[in-house]
Amino acid sequence: MTTPAHVAIIMDGNGRWAKARGMPRLAGHRAGVEALRKTVRAAPDLGISFLTVYAFSSENWSRPKAEVSDLMGLLKLFIRRDLAELHQSGVRVRIIGDRAGLQADIRGLLEEAESLTARNESLTLVIAFNYGGRDEIVRTARKLASAAARGEIDAESITADSFAGGLDTQGIPDPELVIRTSGELRLSNFLLWQAAYSELVFLPCYWPDFSREHLAEALREFAGRERRFGGLGQQDVASRPAAG
């Protein structure tokens, strides 16, 4: 079975999971953290080398202040409680997103996680925090424009590859598979550049219910697809009339 090296997940449905059980939204987010732990443990066993998770979008700041505060607290708790285990398990942590507007203590924790695990190789866990695909593209364009204005690069020499090299995901391969839970059918501003040719799998379960079997199910779905990258599939090639 063909296994994608890089799987990205939109972890959606924490609030609805909690509401369906008559629980506060925070309970859903806490259950979501536990689902993340299980997924991180399962990923290397299933042959995944890179796992990117949409933890907090740049649009999430518009949520009620109490919920934002709860989410920040859960991030701090996750890193403080789980970082040692991640490191011992050989997991490398990478953070993508705009760190400029984050509190100093959160920035420090994110940097600590990256620094401590920088040499690990069993799995790269990419946490998208204060991340938005459009924002990432705009920030990259600004960096390149500034470099061109300083004469450091020739604007005419910018290519898709050189632009990608300026993204937050520099050095990380594009995801072959993007999974979204909760039944919603959209990308929600997630990895807009990187997911250009990704296979998309939408699962009806809410994120707190996501399990190893759900991940394996998505991998089986991926293995059954033919990736064309804008070209012809094998059946299309086989059905073309022979030249003569």
From Swiss-Prot:
The keyword Metal-binding applies. This is Isoprenyl transferase. Its cofactor is Mg(2+). GO terms for biological process: polyprenol biosynthetic process. It is an enzyme of class 2 (transferase). Substrate binds at residues 13-17, 25, 29, 57-59, 61, 63, 180, 186-188. HAMAP family: ISPT (MF_01139). NCBIfam families: PRK14830.1 (NF011405), PRK14834.1 (NF011408), uppS (TIGR00055). Belongs to the UPP synthase family. GO terms for molecular function: ditrans,polycis-undecaprenyl-diphosphate synthase [(2E,6E)-farnesyl-diphosphate specific] activity; magnesium ion binding. The active site is at residues 12, 60. Mg(2+) binds at residues 12, 199. InterPro entries: UPP_synth-like, UPP_synth-like_CS, UPP_synth-like_sf. One of its GO terms (cellular component) is cytosol.
